[in-house]
């Protein structure tokens, strides 16, 4: 299997740490081997360490070096990034994690009861 997720201008990244955690951005410039300049629809243009982002399989074509924010937002909208990203397995797993993290006490109790009921029915069927 060949590695094909390179750090390059136009690559879509998922921010996995910091104030913008969980948001998508696009690499606009590569500063050095550890830092990149990112910009996106819901974040401010900023320098971020590469270790704080997750490279996705998406690459937006025709993104120029230091692309202006307005033009970049148009290209992101044309690419339909949020819809394509929502269909990936990584996005689905992240949605499940956030949903489970936001459960209340009673909701966790209901999940526990349902798991017990499911275990009982599967044990009876054996």
Curated annotation (Swiss-Prot):
Can you quote a single GO CC term? Answer: cytosolic large ribosomal subunit
Any idea what this protein is called?
A: Large ribosomal subunit protein eL14
Gene name, Swiss-Prot/TrEMBL: RPL14
Asked whether the keyword Ribosomal protein is assigned, the reply is: yes
CDD domains, alphabetically? Answer: eL14
| Biological-process GO terms, alphabetical | ribosomal large subunit biogenesis; translation
Question: What is the species listed in this Swiss-Prot or TrEMBL entry?
Answer: Tetrahymena thermophila (strain SB210)
**Which GO terms label this protein's molecular function in UniProt?**
RNA binding; structural constituent of ribosome
Q: Which family does it belong to?
A: Belongs to the eukaryotic ribosomal protein eL14 family.
Q: Name one Pfam family in it.
A: KOW
Q: Which UniProt keywords apply?
A: Ribonucleoprotein, Ribosomal protein
SUPFAM superfamilies linked: Translation proteins SH3-like domain
């Amino acid at each position: 299997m060949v590695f094909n997720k390179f750090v390059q201008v136009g690559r879509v990244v998922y921010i996995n740490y910091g104030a913008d955690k969980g948001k998508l951005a696009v690499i606009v410039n590569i500063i050095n081997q550890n830092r990149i300049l990112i910009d996106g629809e819901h974040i401010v243009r900023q320098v971020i360490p590469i270790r704080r982002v997750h490279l996705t399989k998406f690459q937006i074509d025709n993104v120029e070096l230091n692309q202006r924010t307005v033009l970049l937002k148009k290209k992101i909208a044309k690419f339909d990034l949020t819809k394509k990203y929502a269909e990936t397995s990584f996005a689905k797993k992240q949605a499940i994690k956030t949903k489970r993290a936001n459960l209340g006490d009673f909701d966790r109790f209901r999940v526990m009861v349902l798991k017990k009921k499911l275990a009982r029915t599967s044990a009876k069927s054996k």
